[in-house]
């Protein structure tokens, strides 16, 4: 109640006046509808005749009733804020005062808290009416806040203890509740984000697992292909060997003769002689030839640096009996006369030597391996005459040897 002096604690129980209006000409504090209903029900005589004569309309729960409702003659008078005693300087009509009190509760609490702190810091000061007025104002403000928040007509009017620690705790509680609400909102947002990230991580894990599985399948397929390539390479190598043998056989068949006469062309004579002297290639084998289509299989063996008694002095030329496909049908030992010729490419004077096989020699028996031991003429032709200018035994680094096997016998 905004007056010159604060009322006694027992003058108005619960911080509200005993009647809605006792002195219409004086601004009154707001009275909640709960107190108003209680006053109207308990004692109608306390309502002034002017208020009783007016038709009071029912008010909604939690709505404050002021003198503006019943005394129109003072509706426009300016009144001071009930918290003027603690520093609030607002003045205005009852309607604006109602709006001010509804919107300035926080500032009123801070004003009360400042006065309480100052009062608590001065324990020897007057403890009379000022603390009681502050306590009632605080009770009224808390009561109005409770009524507006709940809308309950049965809210009890109470007076909170004037205690700095409780007010500080209340403010801290409000701050913490606001902070908690903000944190809960952030937590909800983060929970949604985490849920989305979890789905993405799960999808990534599934994709990674699928990729690993596919990689394993690809690796196995690659190993299978590599094994297949190795097998194909081996098969190709075998076919190359077979093809090489066929080509060699074909070449031999093209070079071979089947009448007992064989002409052997030797190229790169200088190089071959040098290799023979160095021991790199001691001897040369000629392609095979035959005495007949189904006759003996033979070849020549030449030592360019000599062999045996003709080593380093003569060309040594031998005949080799080879194992043939038709040996079982042929007479043994081999007994045909053999003639060797080193051809003079100027057709002047050929070098000729001949011999008959030694029937007791193993060289002319039926071969038990691929070839028998070579036999022939170790002193076939002197090396000193090989490059003779009078003859063309070697021409264009090429020489020709001829073998004639007598097949008439």
Swiss-Prot record:
SUPFAM superfamilies registered for this protein in UniProt: TRAF domain-like
Name of the molecule in the record: TNF receptor-associated factor 1
Keyword hit for Metal-binding: no
Record's function text: Adapter molecule that regulates the activation of NF-kappa-B and JNK. Plays a role in the regulation of cell survival and apoptosis. The heterotrimer formed by TRAF1 and TRAF2 is part of a E3 ubiquitin-protein ligase complex that promotes ubiquitination of target proteins, such as MAP3K14. The TRAF1/TRAF2 complex recruits the antiapoptotic E3 protein-ubiquitin ligases BIRC2 and BIRC3 to TNFRSF1B/TNFR2.
PROSITE patterns reported for this sequence: MATH
Modification Phosphoserine, positions: 139
Domain notes: The coiled coil domain mediates homo- and hetero-oligomerization.
Keywords, in A-Z order: Apoptosis, Coiled coil, Cytoplasm, Isopeptide bond, Phosphoprotein, Ubl conjugation
Post-translational modification: Polyubiquitinated by BIRC2 and/or BIRC3, leading to its subsequent proteasomal degradation. Ubiquitinated by the SCF(FBXL2) complex, leading to its degradation by the proteasome.
UniProt-listed Gene3D superfamilies: 1.20.5.110, Apoptosis, Tumor Necrosis Factor Receptor Associated Protein 2, Chain A
MATH domain sequence ranges: 259-405
């Amino acid at each position: 109640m905004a007056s010159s002096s604060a009322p006694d604690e027992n003058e108005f129980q619960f911080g509200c006046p005993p009647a809605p209006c006792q002195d219409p000409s004086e601004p009154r504090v707001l009275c909640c509808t709960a107190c108003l209903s209680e006053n109207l029900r308990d004692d109608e005589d306390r309502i002034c005749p002017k208020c009783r004569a007016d038709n009071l309309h029912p008010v909604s729960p939690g709505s404050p009733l002021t003198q503006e409702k019943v005394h129109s003659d003072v509706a426009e008078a300016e009144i001071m804020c009930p918290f003027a005693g603690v520093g609030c300087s607002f003045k205005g009509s009852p309607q604006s005062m109602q709006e001010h009190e509804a919107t300035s509760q926080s500032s009123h609490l801070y004003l009360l808290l400042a006065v309480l702190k100052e009062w608590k810091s001065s324990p020897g000061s007057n403890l009379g009416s000022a603390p009681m007025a502050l306590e009632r104002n605080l009770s009224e403000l808390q009561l109005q806040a409770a009524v507006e928040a709940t809308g309950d007509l049965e809210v009890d009017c109470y007076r909170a203890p004037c205690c700095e620690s409780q007010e500080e705790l209340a403010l801290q509680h409000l701050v913490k509740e606001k902070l908690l609400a903000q944190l809960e909102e952030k937590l909800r947002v983060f929970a949604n984000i985490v849920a989305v990230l979890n789905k993405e991580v799960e999808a990534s894990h599934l994709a990674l697992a699928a990729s690993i599985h596919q990689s394993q399948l690809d690796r196995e397929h690659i190993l299978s292909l590599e094994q297949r390539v190795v097998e194909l390479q081996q098969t190709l190598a075998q076919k190359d060997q077979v093809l090489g043998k066929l080509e060699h056989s074909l070449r031999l068949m093209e070079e071979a003769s089947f009448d007992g006469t064989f002409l052997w062309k030797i190229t790169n004579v200088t190089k071959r002689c040098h290799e023979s002297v160095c021991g790199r290639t001691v001897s040369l084998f000629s392609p095979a030839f035959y005495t007949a289509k189904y006759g003996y299989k033979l070849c020549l063996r030449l030592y360019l640096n000599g062999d045996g008694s003709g080593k380093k002095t003569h060309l040594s030329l031998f005949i080799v009996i080879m194992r043939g496909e038709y040996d079982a049908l042929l007479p043994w030992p081999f007994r045909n006369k053999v003639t060797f010729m080193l051809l003079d490419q100027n057709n002047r004077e050929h070098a000729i030597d001949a011999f008959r096989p030694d029937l007791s020699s193993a060289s002319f028996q039926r071969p038990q391996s691929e070839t028998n031991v070579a036999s022939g003429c170790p002193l076939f032709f002197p090396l000193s005459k090989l490059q003779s200018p009078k003859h063309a035994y070697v021409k264009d680094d090429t020489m020709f040897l001829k073998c004639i096997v007598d097949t008439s016998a």
